[in-house]
From Swiss-Prot:
Entry-linked InterPro entries: Astro_capsid_N, Astro_capsid_p, Viral_coat
Stretches the record annotates as Basic: 1-69
Protein name, per record: Capsid polyprotein VP90
GO cellular component term, pick one: T=3 icosahedral viral capsid
Family statement drawn from the similarity comment of this UniProt entry: Belongs to the astroviridae capsid polyprotein family.
Keywords, sorted A to Z: Capsid protein, Clathrin-mediated endocytosis of virus by host, T=3 icosahedral capsid protein, Viral penetration into host cytoplasm, Virion, Virus endocytosis by host, Virus entry into host cell
Core attachment, as annotated region: 393-422
Site (Cleavage): 312-313, 392-393, 422-423, 645-646, 653-654
Gene source species: Human astrovirus-5
Region (Disordered): 1-58
Compositional bias of kind Polar residues: 1-16
Amino acid sequence: MASKPSKQVTVEVNNGRSRSRSRPRSQSRGRDKSVKITVNSRNKGRRQNGRNKHQSNQRVRNIVNKQLRKQGVTGPKPAICQRATATLGTVGSNTSGTTEIEACILLNPVLVKDATGSTQFGPVQALGAQYSMWKLKYLNVKLTSMVGSSAVNGTVVRVSLNPTSTPSSTSWSGLGARKHLDVTVGKNAVFKLKPADLGGPRDGWWLTNTNDNASDTLGPSIEIHTLGRTMSSYQNQQFTGGLFLVELASEWCFTGYAANPNLVNLMKSTDKQVNVTFNGSAGEPLVMSVPATSHFVRAVVARSTLPTSLARAGERTTSDTVWQVLNTAVSAAELVTPPPFNWLVKGGWWFVKLIAGRTRNGTRSFYVYPSYQDALSNKPAICTGGLPSGLRAASAVATTLQFTQMNQPSLGHGENTATLGRSIATAGDRLKVILTVGQPVTPNENNKQTWVGKTNTPTEEVVKIGVNTQNYNVMNGFTMISSIDWYDEEMQPLEVPVPMSELLVMKGINKKADVYAAQQYKNSISNNKHQITSVYLVRVKENFQVTNHLSYFFREKVDTTATELMKIRPQTYYTTVNFVQNNWYLLTSTVLHTGSLPSGWVWMNQELMNNENYIVDQGMKHLMTTPPVSSQLYFEMLTSLPQAMAEHFDQGDQAVVAHDSPGQALFSAEETDSDFESTEDETDEVDRFDLHLSSESDDDDVENNRVTLLSTLINQGMSVERATRITSNAFPTRAARLRRSVYNDLLVSGLGPDAAWSHACEQARKVGDNHDLQASGSRGHAE
């Protein structure tokens, strides 16, 4: 019996356009307009079973794909593929009842990061910085519910695909016209996308370098919106927690090796409760203003390079670094924007570039761009009108900004150009600060004096700056600071340093502010009388107010022999002063000490006195006459207290020991809450762990035990400072044990604390040096 004829499969590939009428025939001769591939898909003979049929189909697929690759219609072959699951953050609750954007995820591999403020990277970002092209084989957007299905109600979540990664004015119905998935709160969901949904303009490939054309680099984006106010099912109030955890599970393919290592350092972070305003006039660019002290501005300034050349008349130069800004708060609808770009801000995300120039009124300005391509081309949004007169004086709206660094003008290694960037001040560094003065609090309309604290202040209203509730200075003067420029000793720009862990600002026993820098000036009025002024640069952690008697300095004498002597006005004013959260203040404490001038940092809880003369020293000049608003003050300060001892007496004749006393335990923010858990001593914590150390313990074992205990305490949720103190007490070093022993013996023998501690430290250093020499010698002998 004759077999049936074989089935023929024909694939036609168009790899060129038809010849132009104006082109000579010779130029197009020999070029095929299409390629035909004929494949015999069935073997002759017996009828195929299921297995043979599958093999035949696979054979056809392989042959067709091979021929298509030969013709160059599928783009280059992937050099490497990487499967990864990226955790991008959470979907928040809806607080307005209207459509709110919760996330906008750009799929370029170097931009796929979580909003933690870290520049750390994974395998996808590392490969993106090494190859010039990328594409996606598939993409699954996983939404993992963070609440039960019965815990909240009233909200639906919509995940949609934006194929152009460009902001648009879309309603809930418009989002439904896209490829999308609706998700019910309390249930897990997966939004699946195929290669046909994710293909790029270059035979399915996208470019990796975000400095290139936006339409070739960004790829599609995933947007997540919510509709309907989220309410708690168990309480008659709104639910403000997270609804879903967002993850991307995908396989990225890369080709075309071209290393751009700096692309892995793109930053993504979030700034909560930041004040944002928009302004502009007809024919002028739309400008966004943000406080210079905000985390957003500090991050942008640190990562932006501003040109020093002058722009043309009427223009302002901008940085080359572009930032995507996503407003995830309900206040997006409350932001007042000049026309016609109200839709852009209400849509929830846009692009900005930093404008060159100094800080004005404590804010930095940004040009706003409606698309990434416009930002690269430096074409800002142009307003057709200004704000209505009734809205120009509207106060800034506090909102939440999630910002992403889109590009990096320099793609090489950045370590060799550190002098052009900003370093981070470390503990013990000396730095220089230029403070821009904010609105002063003054006793009269002429602003000729500045408020300072007066004597007889109620105890509960005293503001203390110190290491604890026993060793502190009393705040006398206070000046509001609108912005700060940080520099090192060579006037190179610095990042904002971390707060000084050993210092805190207290009202009563509760911590109210962090101290970032400090300085102390000592001047002799006579051989036996000295004036000590301390200045502290602080940032308020929570709002608080102080109500007490205030006065101000005046010059009692005007003759040439006593022009530096100042006194406090005996008249006082019972006034309330408010200290605002996140604002910067320069706090001043001035004390008079009788006796020999002490060394080290001096702590005296002494207030200003009416009957004493004060000199205008380095830390008090701004308190004598009020500096104008936006004027600048210059100080050289420290980010860590000097490690020295000093002993002196306050006005109550009580001994006060300076910082770094051996028996002095510092307490951190966790121990200064309203509950104040200082009753539990570190020795109690050590006993709770049942740790006993003999003097013959091996140093290596002690070090291992110390590391193990420290890790255990931190993993249990204890603060690093407290865990370190407990670990040091449980497993002290040989030098620490000797220093403690010698110090206690000398105190018992009648030696003073200062001399005893100095002698104990010297003995500990000698033992440490001898131990190092012995260890080195034994290693050399063994070798």
